[in-house]
Amino acid sequence: MKIERLKGFRDHYPDDMEIRYDFIKKMMDTAISFGYKMIDFPSLESMDLYRLKSGTELVEQTFSFTDKGGREVTMIPEATPSTMRMLTSRKDIKMPARWFSIPKVWRYEEPQEGRYREHIQFNADMFGADSPEADAEIIGLAATILDNLGLSGQYEINVNDRYLMELILRDLGSNNPVDLFPVIDRFKKMDLTDFKKRLLKDLDDDASEKLISLLMNRIDINDVERLLNGYANDVMERVKRLKDTFALTSKYTKSKLNIDLSVVRGLSYYTGIVFEAFDISGELRAILGGGRYDNLSNLFINESIPAVGFAIGDAVIELLLKRNNLWNYKDKRKRYYVVNISSSPEAHIEILNKIRGSGNIAISEVNKRRMQTIIKYAESIKCDFLIIIGDRELSSKKMTIKNLRTQEQAEMNIDDFINNINS
């Protein structure tokens, strides 16, 4: 019986995983350089964790079921609720706290380019700081990660402020601006006529036209005040905070920063600043997204903890790296293939241990194949050197070493090799 891989899921073979692990490690190293520390949490959570604040659409996309104890549980569709659950479970965490995580997440969506039902997601969050400095650091970390992956100049970051949008919508006459956020989030995906019909349920015709005009274009931060001139004072106060954040963020990256009032993010827990990054061609879905969610902690404790963060999925990053010819990995370690043809079955093990202990890679021949077959195999798995230990070499404490790149071959004293392996 043939059992096929499930739709929307991926297999990752060794060559692919080497590259994937390399770019994940670069993300980790970048976060650590900013002072962020790694956390982890279960892949399975209570369904209530997502019903409370993530929004109806996300709940409908979960891989959920009733467990043997009668509890409704789900494979985690995102990391933020679990992270906040962890944060609020302890009182000894010093603020501001900087955390990152790299879980697998699951959503029952229709698979398409850059979207799968299971993917690896890098998350970074800062807790206990509500300031333009904190917002800029988070956006700056996201940008630095992309730059360190070799993508500098290949993306731009679109920024908005949910509080700002709420104030604008109230100024335009909406009594329930938060209800319009899911609609605005689909602005670029909807037919304009259908979009306006939906707006007219909350706004009059003139206000709908004004809002569509605001959403149509990405604008420079210096043009925001002119664009929003005449709106309430509260609007202009939020604009000032955005300008302060932009001024700081621009010191982290040379990539283009835009104000895009259509960016509100789909999840209902976002509060202040929100942002997304896209490739400059505009052909791919969002590379990353994030924002501020200062009120999410209230679901767990009677206290608001300022929080801001972002997430990067591995699927879109893979597409972008491939399009820029960056989907490759060169291991800097030397790879040795060690063959023991002596009468002593353990003669090669010390050499294997010494190679591995030096930080390099040692692979042992375990099938006792013909030498020509061994050489072809060693070359196929990208080994740099072949080491042969036979009775003749062993009697004089020597070994034969062959450079598989140049095909040069020589005998070498075993002790000399061990003592100079990294020279």
From Swiss-Prot:
Family matches, as InterPro entries: aa-tRNA-synth_II (IPR006195), aa-tRNA-synth_II/BPL/LPL (IPR045864), Anticodon-bd (IPR004154), Anticodon-bd_dom_sf (IPR036621), His-tRNA-ligase (IPR015807), HisRS-like_core (IPR041715), HisRS/HisZ (IPR004516)
GO biological process: histidyl-tRNA aminoacylation
Reaction catalysed by this enzyme: tRNA(His) + L-histidine + ATP = L-histidyl-tRNA(His) + AMP + diphosphate + H(+)
Primary localization: cytoplasm
A GO molecular-function annotation: ATP binding
Keyword Cytoplasm among record annotations: yes
Coiled-coil residue windows: none
Keywords: Aminoacyl-tRNA synthetase, ATP-binding, Cytoplasm, Ligase, Nucleotide-binding, Protein biosynthesis
Cell compartment(s), UniProt: Cytoplasm
Cellular-component GO terms for this entry: cytoplasm
SUPFAM superfamilies membership: Class II aaRS ABD-related (SSF52954), Class II aaRS and biotin synthetases (SSF55681)
ATP-binding as UniProt keyword: yes
Record-listed E.C. numbers: 6.1.1.21
UniProt family annotation: Belongs to the class-II aminoacyl-tRNA synthetase family.
Entry protein name: Histidine--tRNA ligase
Naturally occurring in which organism (per UniProt): Picrophilus torridus (strain ATCC 700027 / DSM 9790 / JCM 10055 / NBRC 100828 / KAW 2/3)
Primary gene name: hisS
